[in-house]
């Protein structure tokens, strides 16, 4: 089974643009970057030439002989089983972090040979660039970020009829219970598998919970091997400890990140580099608090107050050793962590369309708004509730203080719009902004 990835549409827009720079594709390990690039090549080009700088060390010589694109292409043609023809061949530079000269060459292709279509990607690209002090040709590449499979992509593969029904909704009106139940059922399954392609496909093909867990555990094991391969040896124990503390951080009623949860007596200065490493690797998202919801939100960021979420809800579930059956069947003792999973899944759905990590707001422990989104000239408060539990005063406190024009509450209750409040089922997170002004 194939799961269509929306980023391929962005690649198509890039190809059709009058002018284009080489793409530098960023994203965590195992999210399907190589597959998406190759799929795009199959759909839109006569030929696809992939050069893997991790497996083909001999490719380095093609970039050390000359910086001229024409000469580089001539050298690369010796390693390509397909013709290299501008406009007809997609060039994929995979694992580009293993060849700094190839990364630098993107500047020259941008300036001197824009007729070539090049997408470069790499595992842990952000980490490698920092550690090896590599230079990214700023302004000469178009940076794109790829994320794990979203629920929208998952639903399109699992139930195309329900997907098409949702796509056609123009006004935020109540859904039939049949549609709502279908969405909730598929969403719970998605929260179990997450958006790592192999795990999501395993779930869609009904290979069983154990198969999904084995795949996710394999990815977690690979991530921890990456610590040893790419991190400073002095930081490896801290990265391990911080990463493994994530479930405990999110299981707290107040999900604010606390260093002492990582290790007794831990201080921020001891773990900041480890936290940055995990961010650069695309494994976590740091959601900072703001002192007040003012414009721009970045001006009110509180750097030392933040929450940390996993890049994928399936990986978070497996890291926490939470059985998938509990997520699907909603066992009674599944309480605080249910809220953490709900928030993580909503954040995961918001990021691809919103484009940047949001902020959050808290008022002396008395009220908290999970996410704040900045859209043009307004700040939109976003509440996330687990399942049908929507009680709480946080949004009331926020409304009384700041009087937002629009607000969103994600839960498992039905879709409706009422006096500036968009109540949206969590499975429909990616459609919410479309309905906000209706």
Where are the regions a protein language model picked out?
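N-terminal pre-Walker A segment at the start of P-loop NTPase domains
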Residues: 1-16
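Conserved lysine of the Walker
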Residues: 33
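Conserved P-loop NTPase "ATPase switch" module shared by AAA+ and STAND
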Residues: 84-102
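Hydrophobic positions on the alpha1 helix immediately C-terminal to the Walker A/P-loop
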Residues: 36, 40
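Short glycine-rich substrate-engagement loop in P-loop NTPases that contacts/grips substrate
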Residues: 55-87
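Accessory nucleic acid-recognition modules appended to NTPase machines
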Residues: 200-374
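Structural recognition of the conserved hydrophobic beta-strand(s) that form the central parallel beta-sheet
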Residues: 92, 117-123, 145
